[in-house]
């Protein structure tokens, strides 16, 4: 089997999953702490996408931990195919959500100047949530690339 950093069942794979989960949860918390985020579709989509990402990465993180403790090999063709599809789907959804939320934040701050006009609008929290979503996406994209590489090498 190919020795790639971040493959499932290793500490590198567990670290990738932990990073995905932590940044997805941080993005959800930052957005949920912003009053009125439900008035904007892009922010609701960000919360939904990060929720899916958090569940996916938590599940696979538990599987990685299980494989590490019992010294199991997770590099089987069927499992790898499932990991590739799941990682690619969640990476695409995370990127789309992060971009849409960041686009709305830029619109509010730089184009429409809504953040200056309405000091009650929690633009800083919106920014932080979008930034955490992009960080989550970097871990998710790295994991998707590793899984694709491993599936191609089987």
UniProtKB/Swiss-Prot annotation:
Keyword Transport: no
Primary location: membrane
Localization (cell): Cell membrane
Family indicated by similarity: Belongs to the Casparian strip membrane proteins (CASP) family.
Cytoplasmic side: 1-17, 64-87, 152-154
One GO CC term, this protein: membrane
Record field: transmembrane: 18-38, 43-63, 88-108, 131-151
Extracellular topological domain: 39-42, 109-130
InterPro entries, A to Z: CASP_dom, CASPL-5
Positions of glycan attachment: 39
Protein's UniProt name: CASP-like protein 5B1
UniProt keyword terms in alphabetical order: Cell membrane, Glycoprotein, Membrane, Transmembrane, Transmembrane helix
Membrane topology label: Multi-pass membrane protein
Protein's UniProt keywords contain rRNA-binding: no
Pfam (any one): CASP_dom
Binding partners and assembly: Homodimer and heterodimers.
């Amino acid at each position: 089997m190919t020795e790639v950093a971040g493959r499932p069942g290793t500490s590198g794979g567990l670290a990738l999953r932990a990073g995905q989960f932590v940044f997805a949860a941080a993005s959800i918390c930052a957005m949920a702490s912003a009053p009125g985020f439900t008035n904007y579709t892009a922010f609701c989509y960000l919360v939904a996408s990060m929720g899916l990402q958090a569940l996916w990465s938590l599940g696979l993180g538990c599987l990685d931990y299980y494989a590490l403790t019992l010294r199991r090999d997770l590099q089987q063709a069927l499992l790898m195919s499932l990991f590739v599809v799941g990682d690619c789907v969640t990476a695409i959804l995370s990127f789309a959500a992060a971009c849409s939320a960041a686009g709305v934040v830029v619109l509010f701050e730089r184009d429409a100047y809504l953040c200056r006009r309405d000091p009650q609008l929690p633009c800083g929290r919106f920014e932080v949530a979008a930034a955490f979503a992009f960080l989550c996406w970097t871990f998710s994209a790295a994991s998707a690339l590793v899984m694709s590489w491993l599936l191609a090498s089987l």
